[in-house]
Amino acid sequence: IDDYINAEEIVDFYNKNIDLQSLKILVVVNTVTSAQNLYLHISKQIGKENVKLLHSKFTVEDRKNLEYEIIEDGKYENNKHIIWIATQVVEASLDLDFDFLFTEFAELSSLFQRMGRCNRKGLKHISAPNIYVYEKIAGGLLCRDKAGYGTEKKGFIYYSLYELGKAALHKWKLQTSSSEMSEEDKICMINEFYNREKICEIEKNSSYSSYIKDYYDRYDRLIEISGMDIQDSEMQDSFRTIVSINAVPYDVYMDNFDLISSIENEILAKR
């Protein structure tokens, strides 16, 4: 779909298909903020009891409970009417089998992981499209070099992989005689479009960050530090471009104030 993912189309789809025996919809977006905004808009229109949210910024306990809930809702045998809105946290490790998927575009490997959360077992009869991919994404998600953008690299999706991924899906759509994408189709797209020659051609005159350059920079860094005694924090600085700060919600902090104070006092006493 040549558009940005939006609440209106998801709500419209939900309402039009309300008579289905099972209407389990998984919505996957690229940022926590997008997930939160979609949740607010969709839950306002169809009710909070039918919409749930999962992302990486929940407290450990809340996220554990939500992961249990989404796994239960996402079981093949559970027929429900529910919309789950999530980020990349559902791409791996969670065994989910939803009826429909609405997703923002990401590079192909991430996109295929998301697709695997819809009709996972391949046992559901499919008479109409069950996966909707929205090609347009916010420009701020595309990787930019540090120069002119502060001390940190901006974005986390490589422009070259984004453009080649779209080209791969367009070619598949034009050439296939089936509306079902096979595992062989996915492998062929990766091999044909995510190769060095095509990536370099896209990046030749691009102002965006170079996937090829970053790949070899990190490879050289890995060779450099192999065998060295290096701390986890240093490893993350070398290979992880996302900067975040852990925080405790105020009400959680106050509920555990005595315990936290006791631990702090024990630490101070040992110094």
Question: Where are the language model's segments positioned?
Answer:
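Generic beta-sheet signal
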Residues: 23-27, 52, 80-84
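C-terminal helicase lobe and adjacent C-terminal extensions/tails of nucleic-acid helicase motors
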Residues: 12-16, 28, 33, 37-73, ...
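Conserved two-lobed SF2 helicase motor
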Residues: 76-91
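Interdomain hinge/linker at the junction between the two RecA-like core domains of SF2 helicases
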Residues: 1-20
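Short loop/helix-cap segments at secondary-structure boundaries that form the rim of catalytic
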Residues: 92-96
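Conserved phosphoryl-transfer motifs of two-component systems
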Residues: 100
